[in-house]
Amino acid sequence: LRVTRRGFLKLLAGGASILALSRLISMKGRADVVRPPGAIVEEHFNSLCLRCEVCLEVCPSKAIVLAGLEDGISAANTPKIDPLRGPCEFLVGRCQDSMRCTKECPTGALQPVGRDEIKLGSVELDRERCIAWLETGECLVCDEVCPVLGAISINEDLKPVFHEDKCVGCGTCVYACPADPKALVLLPRGARRVAWPR
């Protein structure tokens, strides 16, 4: 069996394509994204969301962005919260009384909800990046900007401690974190989703 250079390159390209396709297929069910307020349960969210981007357009802090392929095929081009772009201001700020994303969603993938019903996820602290925990300086920015009483406490060593049961996942602390790279990450862990049909 004699393989030409062209034949070898075709085999190599074919193998790379199969590898890429298998990676995409393995990401299909993955949906580790933080959804905007009022998001219905994930199994119905992806089928109901038109990917129309209305929620992105009306978000005053531009915290809502489109999920990419890295978030899974089923989640691709659906809205997610990116606290690096801005916090979700449903508690304080420009959005606290309107939550236009929930009111203007044409399909009901985002449902109007009360502020006290919202839990987008939880923030996780990486002590190896946190300025206060590294003792490279004093920093309590996360505690200073957090709009939820008791979500962050300061221990006796003047270091922030996060309380998942109180955190609502607005991402205000993530956005404000001065560490580079950020010491905080917003995860969908503990997110409260709206039952569907309601």
Spans of features found by a protein language model:
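Non-ligating segments of multi-cofactor redox enzymes
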Residues: 1-198
